[in-house]
Amino acid sequence: MARFTLPRDLYHGKGALEALKSFTGKKAMICVGGGSMKRFGFLDRAVGYLKEAGMEVELFEGIEPDPSVETVMRGAEAMLKFEPDWIIAMGGGSPIDAAKAMWIKYEYPEITFEEMCKVFGIPPLRRKAHFCAISSTSGTATEVTAFSIITDYQKGIKYPIADFEITPDVAIVDPDLAETMPKKLVAHTGMDAMTHAIEAYVSTAHCDYTDPLAIFAIRMIQGDLVDSYNGDMSKRDSMHNAQCLAGMAFSNALLGIVHSMAHKTGAAFADYGAHIIHGAANAMYLPKVIAFNAKDPEAKKRYGVIADEMKLGGSNDDEKVKLLIEYLRGMNDALNIPHCIQHYGPDSYPAEQGFVPEEVFLERLPEIAKNAIADACTGSNPRQPSQEELEKLLKCCYYDTEVDF
């Protein structure tokens, strides 16, 4: 038996933020990030709508990119003090992911972070509060998913929390918010969405309910992302819907080792002054993982279907896989995303010499590969890698070399 879970309500289209006026409750806590929602006036509007609905409102501000365990614990403490019956998470993937984890801790104060990370092991929520997610970026789709990513900076590891319990009750997908994204964020979140859709389509957990969502999202992203990056606001609006469809697909079909490796490399070199931004990591690793997974006959066939839907040509599946890989690498070029870790600069742009030294990468490689194999996303990958294979694959992602194994 399989399960397909989405938010009960999804409000979409320009002006959808006004849906907050219709909420019923006594207290709402709004969780936000670094200030863009306040700067562009969306936070004040959200507060006004909730007060119009008769609620007392409190803010938890300053959630950092790649939110930490410590931030989650501070937010949960604030919730325990304020006792909201609505948690409103607003912004990009980071504040929404953090708020999901805070929600768990608010409902179960004794739960540990390690217990939260047990895959599909969260006890029933909604005893104290319901959850609304309002996305301002077009990539993570955490507003409709059963996932949250939290970083343990002491270990340098990003941990996925995965459980249908943390699927939001309400999602608000208002493209007005996405129109404020800076160009680099458009690129990274957009390739995150493309990775979600492609991994969902080839996942071992894909089904008749997820396949149409994944394929349609791929086609939309192909048509919209580069133009959105170059300033076409109608395409920016369309991308906001495309990434949400990709999220619906992967939340139910799950993901694969592109995400496993992105999770485990993202903060692994933070002591060298930067992170490998999640969407950029996905963009770099996706072509390599396609080449690796395509050694599996069923996966190769499904990549061929993706290439057909994208109208890339090719007379057989081997040719189609090659054309798909070439197309995705071309998208990275168009979006100014590097092809490998070796040329990933501290500002995330292509650099002659990246910020991760070769000797440091090789020294940490076995541990990174071990952690990636244990990641929650690995189990649904169409080809299960050994420790040796994943180390070789990560080397290909570092040096941009051919995957021939």
Feature-to-residue mapping (PLM):
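C-terminal charged capping/lid subdomain of soluble metabolic enzymes
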Residues: 307-405
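Short Gly/Thr/Asp-enriched flexible loops that form oxyanion-binding sites at enzyme active sites
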Residues: 74-76, 95-109, 144-145
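Glycine/serine-rich anion-binding loops at beta->alpha junctions
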Residues: 84-100, 136-142, 275-276
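A glycine/threonine-rich phosphate-anchoring loop and its flanking beta-alpha core
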Residues: 107-206, 301-305
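ATP/NTP phosphate-donor binding region
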Residues: 1-86, 341
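Active-site segments that bind and position negatively charged phosphate/pyrophosphate groups
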Residues: 200-327
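Residue-level signal for short, function-critical loop segments
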Residues: 34-35, 137, 289
